[in-house]
């Protein structure tokens, strides 16, 4: 029996846009992602799948059914977000901003927020949506769930980001994270949500995987993410505005709440192809991970010609680690290259070049990377950690029981090394809308019938239930702490 500390959280994470729609009255047409996946040009060119989120699992209308199943599995924690476009479907009066902050890369040092301004915002909020979020959170709280309330999971109100115009090279409209106004608006939104729902939240996250937003949106057009405009310069602008937005949202939440505030980041574990590629690992980690966290923990920046910005320093109480697979790198003139055949660059339902099985998404089974990521964060920053997402696209549920046990084992291994890991939240409780890939990728412990909205337990849900009941990995499940046996091909 591999036991976890008393009070350790076992739960699940989910996204509003991916899970909420699917029942009458649940559609939210006012976000950039909603516009993006409905765009005919995107669908015809296969930038997106053509699946539509309004046909989703229906959490908005059936949340109690989801919570019932989570209770049966024995979960005690959840990360859930409030959709910005539901609360403020129309623009707020433009805030008073410092000179120059309508420009794409102007510094945002502070955002003036007080109760009078929050009450003014209250006049513009969609109180029907806010009341429904309160009902959802109250139901979770009444069942004893630890609630990590997240402010942002990739969607922006359409009045802040018109991705179709940006995709076409038209920057005269709302440009999202390319404009400092979004930094101000995000701080205001975060303060407002905390002001209205603080009695129900256990703690807060400002954002989930912001690095995917600036990366997939501007640097990796094959991902199919808005605005799908290839520009490394714009990617850097979006990154710095997001860094500022986190810091200003942290301050905004702290102005109305005493609860802890973290951020959740998309992580891979970098491995060298050969020993001489260790420098490539260091470069990849610095560019893709440490540059972001050094900004919001140490205040260190480089793009504005100064070493430290005090308004960014110490704006973090804990770190949320999302991990799915690794990345293998090698040295290159540009610093490093990622190699196909490993990590998330494999053939679907096949074998990686390391002879490890891959998922429905083509992601390599590699649990040791989670331990490595946790250890590196802990050694560098010493802040409490949560595993906030970890899961696998596996409709048949063949690999998921192995994936679940072997990754939770790596968390236990990190705990034994003295790493302060406070919870493991699986992605996800139920199948949902996988962004540009639509409904084809199924990550759920529960299988969703999208026509009837019924939920069916997969075997992995039973495995997770045994772990939560034991607060650890019981001996009878330890045989799953391994790479899944490779299934023979049928002739």
UniProtKB/Swiss-Prot annotation:
It is an enzyme of class 3 (hydrolase). InterPro entries: Beta-galactosidase, Glyco_hydro_1, Glyco_hydro_1_AS, Glyco_hydro_1_N_CS, Glycoside_hydrolase_SF. The lineage of its organism: Archaea, Thermoproteota, Thermoprotei, Sulfolobales, Sulfolobaceae. Signal peptide: none annotated. Keywords: Glycosidase, Hydrolase. The active site is at 209 (proton donor), 389 (nucleophile). Its EC number is 3.2.1.23. One of its GO terms (molecular function) is beta-glucosidase activity. Pfam families: Glyco_hydro_1. Thermostable. Belongs to the glycosyl hydrolase 1 family. It catalyses: Hydrolysis of terminal non-reducing beta-D-galactose residues in beta-D-galactosides. SUPFAM superfamilies: (Trans)glycosidases (SSF51445). This is Beta-galactosidase. GO terms for biological process: carbohydrate metabolic process.
């Amino acid at each position: 029996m591999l036991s976890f500390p008393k009070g350790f959280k076992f739960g699940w994470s989910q996204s509003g846009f991916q899970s909420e729609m699917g029942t009458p009255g649940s559609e939210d047409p006012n976000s950039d992602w909603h516009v993006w996946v409905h765009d005919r040009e995107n669908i015809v060119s296969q930038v997106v799948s053509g699946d539509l989120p309004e046909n989703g699992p229906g959490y908005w209308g059936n949340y109690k059914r989801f919570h019932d199943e989570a209770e049966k599995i024995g979960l005690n924690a959840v990360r859930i977000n409030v959709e910005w476009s539901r609360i403020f479907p129309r623009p707020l009066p433009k805030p008073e901003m410092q000179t120059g902050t309508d420009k794409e890369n102007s510094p945002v040092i502070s955002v003036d927020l007080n109760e009078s301004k929050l009450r003014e915002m209250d006049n513009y909020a969609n109180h029907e949506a806010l009341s429904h979020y309160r009902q959802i959170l109250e139901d979770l709280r009444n069942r004893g769930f630890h609630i990590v309330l997240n402010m942002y999971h990739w969607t922006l109100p359409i009045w802040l980001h018109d991705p179709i115009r940006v995709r076409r090279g038209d920057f005269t409209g709302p440009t999202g994270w390319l404009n400092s106004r979004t930094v101000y608006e995000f701080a205001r939104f975060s303060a407002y949500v905390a002001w209205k729902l603080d009695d129900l939240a256990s703690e807060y996250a400002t954002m989930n995987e912001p690095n995917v937003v600036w990366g997939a949106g501007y640097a990796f057009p094959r991902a199919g993410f808005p605005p799908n405009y290839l520009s490394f310069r714009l990617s850097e602008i979006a990154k710095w505005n997001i860094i500022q937005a986190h810091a200003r949202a942290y301050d905004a939440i702290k102005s109305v709440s005493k609860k802890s505030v973290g951020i959740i980041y998309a992580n891979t574990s970098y491995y060298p192809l050969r020993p001489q590629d260790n420098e490539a690992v260091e470069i990849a980690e610095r560019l893709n991970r440490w540059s972001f966290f050094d900004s919001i923990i140490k205040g260190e920046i480089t793009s504005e010609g100064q070493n430290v910005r005090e308004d960014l320093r110490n704006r973090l109480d804990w770190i949320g680690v999302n991990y799915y697979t690794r990345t293998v790198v090698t040295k290159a003139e540009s610093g490093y290259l990622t190699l196909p055949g490993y990590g998330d660059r494999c053939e679907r339902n096949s074998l990686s070049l390391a002879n490890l099985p891959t998922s429905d998404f083509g992601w390599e089974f590699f649990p040791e990377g989670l331990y490595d990521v946790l250890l590196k964060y802990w050694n560098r920053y010493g802040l409490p950690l949560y595993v906030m997402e970890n899961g696998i696209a596996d409709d048949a549920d063949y690999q998921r029981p192995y994936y679940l046990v072997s990754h939770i084992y790596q968390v236990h291994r990190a705990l034994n090394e003295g790493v302060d890991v406070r919870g493991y939240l699986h992605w996800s409780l139920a199948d949902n809308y996988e962004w540009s890939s639509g409904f084809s990728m199924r990550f759920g412990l529960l299988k969703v019938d999208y026509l009837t909205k019924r939920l069916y337990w997969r075997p992995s849900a039973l495995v997770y239930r045994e772990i939560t009941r034991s607060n650890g990995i019981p001996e009878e499940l330890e045989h799953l702490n391994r790479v899944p046996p490779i299934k023979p091909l049928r002739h």
